[in-house]
Regions:
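Glycine-enriched loop-and-adjacent helix/strand subsegments that border the catalytic/binding cleft
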Residues: 1-139, 184-187, 212-220
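Conserved metal-binding segment of the jelly-roll/cupin
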Residues: 9, 15-16, 89, 146-158
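Residue-level marker for beta-strand->alpha-helix junctions and adjacent short loops that shape enzyme
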Residues: 96-99, 159, 202
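A structural signal for short secondary-structure junctions
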Residues: 106-108, 144-146, 187-192, 205-207
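Generic detector of contiguous secondary-structure segments
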Residues: 137-149
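Active-site pocket scaffolds in enzymes
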Residues: 150-192, 198, 211
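Structural signal for terminal/edge beta-strands and the immediately following C-terminal loop/tail
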Residues: 196-220
């Protein structure tokens, strides 16, 4: 099976402490905790087993999403534009060796800790990625070369045991609420809300730094 992948915005990233402007709360503002990798030049047709060598840096991403806008765009059969504004990135990109034993199988085997308005929202583990980064790179490079600096995101960090680990995005929690109660209970974000994300080594040190951001209304 081919992995789900879309081509996102490449010319703009928010910093880890930036306020994030949006036009309307009605658009369904959602955070989305992810990992990512930055590659060197990847030749067209690179196979998954050869893609590991092209991974040069690991990063932590908040892939902002506008969930109310997404369904209409998905129905077109083309990629997202309005539903996927600029992402945020943590302060530090690290080489794979800096992650030590946590970097294996093309995955980051650490918890992504997420809080929303100072309340724990989830700590899913990156080791449960259904497809490793090396496989994602091979998929993206199947019919094109990837230039040095290309960023490949993991998608939402999510675990099967979500009841214990929580979530890294609101949409997943709302989906589970629909499954188990028949309707979503958790609202999307409001202006003034804050989201924090970080990844800790087992000894407690931060791997990428902290994403600490507030949602604000765009000034007209």
């Amino acid at each position: 099976d081919k992995p789900l992948m879309y081509q996102g915005m490449s010319h703009r990233f928010y910093g880890p402490y930036d306020d994030i402007p949006f036009i309307s709360e009605e658009d369904g503002i959602d955070f989305e905790g992810e990992f990512g990798v930055i590659v060197d030049h990847v030749p067209m047709g690179t196979k998954a087993e050869d893609a590991h060598q092209h991974i040069k840096l690991l990063v932590q991403i908040n892939d902002w999403s506008l969930r109310t806008l997404a369904p209409a765009e998905m129905k077109t059969g083309f990629g997202w534009i309005q539903a996927k504004p600029a992402c945020s990135m943590a302060a530090f990109a690290v080489t794979p060796d800096e992650a030590g034993a946590a970097w294996k199988d093309g995955r980051i085997h650490l918890n992504l800790e997420v809080s929303w308005n100072h309340t724990d929202f989830g700590h899913p583990h990156g080791g449960e990625m259904s497809v490793g980064f090396h496989e994602l790179i091979a998929h993206a490079a199947a019919t094109r070369e990837l230039c040095a600096g290309t960023i490949i995101g993991s998608g939402t960090v999510s675990n099967d045991n979500f009841r214990a680990t929580g979530s890294s995005c609101i949409a997943e929690r709302r989906g589970m609420e629909i499954v188990y109660t028949g309707s979503p209970k958790t609202p999307y974000m409001h202006f003034g809300d804050q989201v924090d994300m970080q990844v800790n080594y087992p000894e407690g040190n931060l791997l990428f730094g902290v994403i600490h951001q507030r949602v604000v209304k765009l000034n007209a």
